[in-house]
Amino acid sequence: MQENQNLSEEFSYDVIAYPSQILLQTHPTHLAAVAKLYGMNPAPADKCRVLELGCGTGTNLNWQAHGFPESEFVGIDLAQNHIVEAKQDAEELGLQNVSFFQQDVMEITEKTFGKFDYIIAHGLYSWVPDFVREKVLSLYDGLLNAEGIGFISYNVYPGAYRRRIMMDMMKFHTRGIETPIEKVKKGIGFIEFLTEQTAQPQLNREILNAEFENLVKYPLEKIYHDELAEVSQPFYFTEFIADAEKHNLKFLSESENLPTQKDNFPEEIIQAFENISRNIVEYEQFADFLECR
């Protein structure tokens, strides 16, 4: 796919819808609280503008909009079936403060929707081509207000290496299967078969068992788009931050595991990481290595 192309060609999410969910870590109240801990003055959640890129069927955004009728919420997704369902749900809930648009992120500018206090992109960044990732970061740079907060989730190394083993096994085993749900079921069945084999080394079996236990918690549709996706690119934390800084974005904090929560580590580990880290970004990277996150 070339940089002058958009994402509209053969979009798999119009074939199999991605199951949306409520994401507590993206709620503007939570994001504002984290920002205040670090000395920022974010817009109050009850009077703000929120943009969600890749909003899916709108479950997360409709939930937020329902709680804050004086705030404005905008959801963008490329899949038409997602937007249709999001609009239907918003109408059934009687929401007047949320809007959903079928839109390619490559076509969005400041003139399209204006500026925002909070921008969310969950389950998007690692599953799009490089030029789209660049566009997403540029939107955060261009569309966030001065005290605006951006939330981006992505698959992270080194932990993603363990997941990659299972993903590659599933992809190889199902390489000739075209039907999405059949592909997922065959892939799951193959991994389950491997977890039952005692011939493989114990470490391999333990890793595969752990990943399989996590895998089967999710709907088949989510597994299809996450584990069997053509594009699924993890990043080291420092790699992502370097790309973000090219777009004038600054790391503030993890949304769930705050960098200040060092109680998980023994004192000697904390001291060692502080001695070899020049900043919080490097400290976070060392922590990821230690936890294989």
Residue ranges with predicted function:
Residues 202-293:
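Rossmann-like AdoMet/SAM-dependent catalytic core
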